Swiss-Prot record:
[4Fe-4S] cluster 2 binds at C152, C156, C159. It is found in: Cytoplasm. Pfam families: Radical_SAM, TRAM_2, UPF0004. GO terms for biological process: tRNA modification. It comes from Gloeobacter violaceus (strain ATCC 29082 / PCC 7421). This is Ribosomal protein uS12 methylthiotransferase RimO. NCBIfam families: 30S ribosomal protein S12 methylthiotransferase RimO, MiaB/RimO family radical SAM methylthiotransferase. GO terms for molecular function: 4 iron, 4 sulfur cluster binding; aspartic acid methylthiotransferase activity; metal ion binding; protein methylthiotransferase activity. The lineage of its organism: Bacteria, Bacillati, Cyanobacteriota, Cyanophyceae, Gloeobacterales. Keywords: 4Fe-4S, Cytoplasm, Iron, Iron-sulfur, Metal-binding, S-adenosyl-L-methionine, Transferase. Transmembrane segments: none annotated. PANTHER family: RIBOSOMAL PROTEIN S12 METHYLTHIOTRANSFERASE RIMO, RIBOSOMAL PROTEIN US12 METHYLTHIOTRANSFERASE RIMO. Belongs to the methylthiotransferase family. RimO subfamily. It catalyses: L-aspartate(89)-[ribosomal protein uS12]-hydrogen + (sulfur carrier)-SH + AH2 + 2 S-adenosyl-L-methionine = 3-methylsulfanyl-L-aspartate(89)-[ribosomal protein uS12]-hydrogen + (sulfur carrier)-H + 5'-deoxyadenosine + L-methionine + A + S-adenosyl-L-homocysteine + 2 H(+). Residues 138-367 form the Radical SAM core domain.
């Protein structure tokens, strides 16, 4: 009789897709999937190990399950970095699976059921799933993430992604479009393209970046919203901006992780080319696409970051008027160049700088959101709050999980795009009412 398996997903949306493929494969093989860990014979945990706090959450989850005596299958980034340590410290782990091996999850479970303790971790991940691999989506019905490439060829000083995910490997345009059509047939209204560096999509496969060509091809798919995450500054070329302009279903939403503004800090981060580009890039986007939404992520407390460097970053944020900003305190990670740099910043200073920068951005976000008041915009309805008699959704300026939401009054329907008049704004969210023409 097939075993019952509970699955826990931790970490980023790239990890989520891997989890969804494992769920699809297990279900196809006849295994029972249950959200209740108490009823499951096995618990599969897809872990994150990108930065310290994520690793702590993964370890805490594993320890809690071990204390309950569960048979644990550990997948994802944590085994990729700490295979031997996990096998030694968590005897309840009946199997571990690396980031390049999740497509063999059925084999792993079957071998573990015979009593074998399975360790399947490729030293260098090379696998990437395509449209033929089964997938069981865990997002709302109308939203799907689509991985266009895996891995990264860059070596930023603070980042361990190349160790966790390997070098970049892109999927063919035809494969991505085929999966997008599958998702459209399932009722998906918003498709979110993800990879480590989306603007480098195709470089390894075609000899040059081809994100613009991919977007044009996806313009022929019946999905109203196509959103791109993880754009690299140098990849936002005129050709790409033109593709966004000319492709009706591609949202002018630019998620561009800049990390810092000061040339000295960027040089230490191994991103020296970026400093002169930042301001000109933002100006060019807004000139071409006045309705563009701009999101970035920044790191404070990087080794050697002085108060002058931090002041430069604050001035840059104030001048740039981003719609959304995520701020991370630098996390010192083994196997990165930054771990060995002099001038490591005390935790208290990192926390203070993060707090100060977030407070600065709150004022800007309030102003940017307030500019939406009075407009009628499409909102994707994702949830109903029956107690408060409101709907929760997102306009095109909000990406799931990382940005805000729109609180909607009036008659709406789940998983549909509804016209909403925006009536109020906070630093993070909007309020509105269903618009009757």
């Amino acid at each position: 009789m097939p075993a019952t398996i509970a699955v826990t997903h931790l970490g980023c949306e790239k990890n989520r897709i891997d989890t969804e493929h494992m769920l699809g494969l297990l279900a196809q093989a006849g295994y029972q999937i249950d959200s209740d860990e108490d009823k499951a014979e096995y618990v599969l945990v897809n872990t994150c190990s990108f930065i310290g706090p994520a690793r702590t959450e993964s370890v805490r989850t594993l320890v809690n399950l071990a204390e309950q005596g569960k048979k644990i299958i550990i997948a994802g980034c944590l085994p990729q970095m700490f295979r031997d340590e996990l096998l030694k410290e968590i005897p309840e782990a009946v199997a571990i699976v690396g980031t390049g091996d999740y497509h063999r999850i059925v084999e792993v479970v079957e071998r573990s059921r015979t009593g074998e303790r399975v360790s399947l971790v490729s030293a260098t991940p090379t696998y990437i799933a395509d449209e033929h691999l089964p997938r069981y989506r865990t997002t709302t019905e109308a939203v799907a993430y689509l991985k266009i490439a895996e891995g990264c060829d860059y070596r930023c000083a603070f980042c361990i992604i190349p160790h966790l995910r390997g070098d970049q490997r892109s999927r063919p345009i035809e494969s991505i479009v085929a999966e997008a059509k599958q998702l459209a047939s399932e009722g998906v209204k918003e498709l979110i393209l993800i990879s480590q560096i989306s603007t480098n999509y195709g470089l390894d496969l075609y000899g040059k970046p081809r994100l613009a060509d991919l977007l044009r091809a996806l313009g022929e798919v019946d999905i109203p919203w196509v959103r791109v995450h993880y754009a690299y500054p140098t990849g936002l070329t005129d050709e790409l901006l033109t593709a966004v302009e000319q492709t009706a279903n591609v949202l002018p939403y630019f998620d561009v992780p800049l990390q810092h503004s000061h040339p000295e800090v960027l040089r230490a981060m191994n991103r020296p080319w970026q400093a002169d580009l930042n301001t000109r890039l933002l100006e060019r986007i807004r000139e071409r696409l006045p309705e563009a939404t701009l999101r970035t992520t920044l790191i404070v407390g990087f080794p050697g970051e002085s108060e002058a460097h931090f002041a430069h970053l604050c001035a840059f944020v104030e001048r740039s008027e981003f719609d959304h900003v995520g701020v991370f305190a630098y996390s010192r990670e083994e196997n990165t160049a930054a771990a060995n740099l002099e001038g490591q910043i005390p935790e208290a200073i990192k926390k203070r700088r993060r707090r100060d920068l977030m407070r600065l951005q709150q004022t800007i976000s309030q102003r940017r959101n307030a500019s939406q008041v009075g407009r009628v915009v499409p909102v994707l309805i994702e949830q109903e709050n029956t107690q408060k008699k409101v709907w929760l959704g997102r306009s095109a300026r909000f990406s799931p999980e990382i940005d805000g939401q729109v609180i909607v009054c009036g008659g709406a329907a789940l998983n549909q795009l509804i016209p909403v008049r925006i009536t109020a704004a906070t630093p993070y969210d909007l309020c509105g009412e269903v618009f009757q023409a």
